[in-house]
Design a protein with these regions (language model features):
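Conserved catalytic cores of very large enzyme subunits
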Residues: 102, 109-510, 531-533, 537-692, ...
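Long insertion/accessory domains within large nucleic-acid-processing enzymes
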Residues: 680-722
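Charged, amphipathic alpha-helical regulatory modules used
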Residues: 1-114, 702-705, 712-722
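Contiguous, well-ordered alpha-helical segments that form the cores/surfaces of helical PPI scaffolds
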Residues: 235, 514-527, 545
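Metallocofactor- and cofactor-centric catalytic cores in central/energy metabolism, strongly enriched
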Residues: 288, 527, 708-712
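A structural signal for well-ordered alpha-helices, especially hydrophobic packing surfaces
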Residues: 81, 85, 103, 470, ...
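Catalytic-loop motifs flanking and including active-site residues across diverse enzymes
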Residues: 18, 22, 514-521, 686
Length: 722
């Protein structure tokens, strides 16, 4: 048995053999693999390594001592780990080569950074890559994404991502923060809160409430990467409207104290009412300017959304009405006004409030008028068929949508995933999503056929891969401290978010969701039997039912709220085509276009009616309860009755319904109409166009340029029913 062993380092110098160095290296690999090794494990590893050293003659004539080259030492440790702890061994091998990988990675980061800086970036329609702040953010994002790919993913996960079988959304952000949320604004405001080491008192007036909510929104949304939704904003603002009303009444009475009588009180109330209405108008105008012109510290324009419509008090209905009227009025110079993009508006539809002849039908009519001019609000059914209406009808709970479409699974106050008893109720506000990973189903089917394997066997492999990624991400984020998002985790913006700054957030993660995304069901059906979702759709339905059964099972096993999400593929719609072609070539109606279809939607080029599209997509509606939207193209903005009939039909079906128009505005003369590239009034080609990207709006053309990628622009040209 050898007793004195030296290690020959890369520079040729000698170093004493030390068990502790082996332990340190193995510990790093174990941490990356999310495996815990104990003292017995380390003792076993060191003993086996020493035994392997003793099997080889390492006597060094020059130094007259047993000396093991460091390269051999690494190989021995690799073999031992692969035999005893394969997962740790894989991570050890990857980490060992990190210097080589790091040089390659930095070279790739530099190349992409130069491309973004001098050519531009259109991967996200909410960013303007011409701005310095955005370029800095993109540079950081490129580095962060490469670090994630090289040091968080396993070899198989990286291969699947590079090939395109799965798509990990927001890789640059996933290790840092959360995705989208329903922010509990009321909880933060009540009693005051701390932000940036400064104490904010609770607002005493409506105009102050608008300002403070704007500050909170910018502060909190910058600490996440997904959509930031303020749910039921009409209810949030109502108490502050009441405070302002009382203040204005007292103000009027103080000025007119020398007068007396009934008419003075009436005049005071009328004065106060008009002042509150003006505060609502200016408040929503302020939000529109702020949310569309001031970039966040992330370098983008935050995806802000608000929902409203079911509040019935004077102040709640006034809030809803003014949000709509301000959007319709537009922003800009006189004669050149056009609607803004943010906040996204969602109208909460209750048949018992907004139905024909009901108390708030007038508010629904106002929302329809607004949508026919601005494409917002989208309409969310609370009383139709399906999951979201069922929660509202049974518990009176509104599930507002996070960002453009994501919805939360139920989480009960006492029982968690399942109600503790008949009196237990679900809670939705204050919860968030921890990230989405999408399956590329056409590629998975093509792989199964290419390798003569059962489709569901291959699908299971990638489902399990996503499951593993979600579990690791869940554990990783749980170690984050509450100080990473103070407004959410310490000031009550999130459910359970009253932690101390140094507390880990793992205790409040159980109510949060993680998503399995789905794209290109139409192309999956085409690859299966050369038929579209309009012509068939049975195989696509079968696959989605299978995935739902799988997700429901592992949700119980892992105690994680997994959800199935209809992916809004932006740049992904083109990337997936490129990935498919690289592996399996160009196949008619599968990969012959520049883009794939979104989620379960019929192909945009289908020449079908609005009713046909609604019925065809209804088949999939209950299989995507983690996020979905249904929209149709309405080239008839002037026909309000037709739009009302079709939206009402969508509400009966339980849809989240969007009205699609192609809004166009001439920058030279201010003329506006649907879908124009050249102004028919003055002949100018300086036209601003607003189109629906997926579940949200963006500029397809502004100042002669687009923030959309080429694949999405190709899709726009073929839109008929979308």
């Amino acid at each position: 048995m050898k007793t004195v062993i030296k290690i020959i380092k890369k520079d040729g110098t000698l170093e004493d053999y030390q068990d502790q160095k082996i332990i340190n290296a193995c510990n790093l690999a174990a941490q990356r693999a999310l495996v815990t090794l104990n003292e017995h494990d380390y003792s076993t590893i060191c003993r086996r390594v020493f035994e392997e050293i003793n099997e080889v003659d390492y006597f060094d004539e020059q130094h007259q001592v047993e000396a093991v080259p460091v390269q051999d030492m690494h190989s021995i440790v690799e073999r031992v780990l692969i035999e005893l702890y394969p997962t740790v061994g894989e991570q050890y091998i990857q980490y060992r080569n990190y210097k080589i990988n790091f040089v390659k990675m930095l070279d790739e980061v530099y190349r992409k950074e130069q491309e973004q800086r001098y050519i531009g970036d259109v991967s996200n329609a909410n960013t303007d890559s011409t701005m310095v702040s955005t370029q800095r953010s993109l540079s950081y994002g490129t580095l962060s994404k490469e670090l994630y790919k090289n040091f968080f993913l396993t070899k198989d996960e990286l291969q699947a991502t590079n090939d395109g079988y799965i798509y990990i959304h927001d890789m640059k952000d996933r290790r840092d923060c959360i995705n989208c949320c329903l922010f509990d604004m009321s909880k933060v405001l009540q009693g005051g809160f701390e932000m940036g080491n400064v104490w904010y008192n609770e607002p005493k007036t409506l105009d102050t409430a608008f300002d403070v909510i704007g500050d909170i929104t910018f502060g909190a949304s910058a600490q996440q990467y997904g959509g930031f939704t303020i749910p039921r904003v009409d209810t949030i603002l109502a108490p502050y409207a009441e405070k302002s009303y009382k203040k204005y009444v007292e103000e009027y009475l103080a000025v007119t104290r020398s007068y007396a009588g009934f008419y003075k009180d009436v005049a005071a109330r009328e004065y106060a009412m008009e002042k509150v209405r003006r505060d609502f108008e200016q408040g929503f105008q302020g939000w529109e300017y702020k949310f569309n012109t001031v970039g966040s510290s992330r370098g983008d324009y935050p995806f802000i959304a608000i929902s409203f419509g079911v509040g019935t008090s004077t102040w709640e209905t006034m809030a809803s009405e003014m949000a709509l009227k301000v959007r319709m009025a537009g922003q800009g110079k006189d004669g050149f006004k056009k609607p803004v993009l943010f906040p996204k508006l969602t109208f909460l539809y209750d048949e018992n409030l907004h139905g024909a002849g009901k108390e708030l039908e007038w508010l629904f009519d106002t929302a329809l008028e607004c949508s026919s001019k601005c494409m917002y609000p989208d309409f969310l059914s609370l009383t139709g068929e399906g999951y979201i209406p069922s929660m509202y009808k049974k518990y009176g709970k509104v599930i507002s949508l996070m960002g453009c479409r994501a919805s939360l699974s139920p989480w009960y106050e006492r029982g968690g995933m399942h109600p503790a008893d008949e009196d237990d109720v679900p809670v939705f506000e204050g919860r968030f999503n921890l990230g989405a990973i999408s399956l590329h189903l056409p590629m998975i089917l093509a792989k199964a056929r290419h390798e003569s394997k059962d489709f569901y066997e291959v699908l299971d492999y990638y489902l399990e891969m996503i499951r593993g990624l979600h579990k690791r991400t869940y554990a990783f984020l749980g170690e984050k401290k509450a100080s990473t998002n103070p407004l959410g985790f310490t000031q009550g913006g999130f459910l359970g978010g009253t932690l101390n700054p140094d507390d880990k957030i793992k205790s409040i993660l159980p109510p949060m969701t993680m998503s399995f995304g789905i794209t290109a069901l139409n192309e999956l059906q085409q690859l299966y039997n050369c038929k579209s979702l309009v012509e068939d759709g049975e195989f696509a339905l079968e696959v989605m039912q299978y995935i739902n059964e799988y997700v429901n099972r592992i949700k119980e096993e892992d105690k994680i709220l997994y959800a199935i999400y209809g992916t809004p593929a932006e740049s992904l719609c083109g990337l997936q085509v490129e990935q498919f072609r690289k592996k399996y070539g160009i196949i008619e109606n599968v990969s012959d276009r520049a883009y794939v279809s979104n989620s379960f939607h019929c192909h945009v080029s289908e020449d079908i009616t609005t009713i046909q599209k609604q019925d065809l997509e209804k088949r999939f509606w209950d299989l995507f309860n983690g996020g979905k939207i249904q929209y149709c193209k309405y080239p008839i903005s002037y026909n309000k009755d037709a739009i009302k009939t079709l939206v009402r039909r969508a509400m009966q079906l339980g849809f989240y319904e969007g009205i699609n128009l192609s809004l166009s505005y001439c920058e030279e003369c201010g003329y506006e109409q649907l879908d124009m590239d050249v102004c028919p009034k003055c002949g100018s080609t300086h036209v601003t166009k607003i189109e629906r990207m997926n579940g949200y709006l963006g500029y397809s053309r502004v100042h002669g340029k687009s923030r959309y990628n080429k694949a999405k622009m190709a899709e726009f040209k073929e839109r008929k029913s979308m």
